[in-house]
A protein has these predicted regions:
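Sequence-level preference for short, compositionally simple segments enriched
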Residues: 2-179
């Protein structure tokens, strides 16, 4: 993916196995939809419907891509929705506010390697098993970083190894996860 800002919705369907998106520095996928925004039928888009990028396919790989939801502080606004199994993100950026990264697939295993993830509230959330290795996780304000919905009986949910948790100076109370 060439350097540039691409304002669009990207969908990687389940049938497209082993897709790779490798970006030049500065490759940004962005959109500004949000959960309470009305669609063409006058219905709210919902959290899932607000995403900039949807990844349903297994064995997806992304490198040097920025996934952004630029809606601002308007409630839930997903940058990347990941449902496919064995998704691997290397040196990617996930930018948003509330609900930035949706690790959706209950049986999905996801790996985030040297990624940057930012948001305000519950900005990493969902059901998947996800490993975050050497990532920077940046809070833009007070709130919870993660809101996992790990099924009881699953061995792992979210695992963080060698990650840095950072935040804006104004943030007074930031918690790793909801109780």
């Amino acid at each position: 993916v060439r350097k540039g800002v691409y304002k669009e919705k990207v969908v990687i369907p389940e049938s497209k196995i082993s897709i790779s998106l490798i970006g030049e520095d500065g490759a940004i996928l962005t959109n500004d939809d949000f959960a309470s925004k009305k669609n063409c039928f006058g219905e709210e888009m919902s959290t899932s419907g607000s995403s900039t990028c949807y990844i349903y396919a297994p064995d997806f790989y992304a490198e040097n891509i920025t996934f952004e939801n630029s809606a601002g502080r308007v409630g839930q606004a997903v940058a990347c929705f990941v449902s496919g199994d064995r998704a691997y993100f290397k040196n990617c950026r996930f930018l948003g506010n509330q609900d930035t990264l949706y690790t959706y697939g209950k049986d999905s295993r996801q790996f985030y390697d040297h990624c940057y993830i930012e948001g305000t509230v519950d900005f990493i959330f969902g059901w998947s098993t996800a490993l975050f290795k050497d990532c920077t996780i940046h809070s833009l304000g007070d709130g919870y970083v993660t809101a996992p919905s790990t099924d009881q009986g699953k061995k792992y949910g979210y695992v963080f190894i060698g990650c840095k948790l950072t935040g804006v100076v104004e943030a007074q109370k930031v918690y790793l996860s909801r109780p």
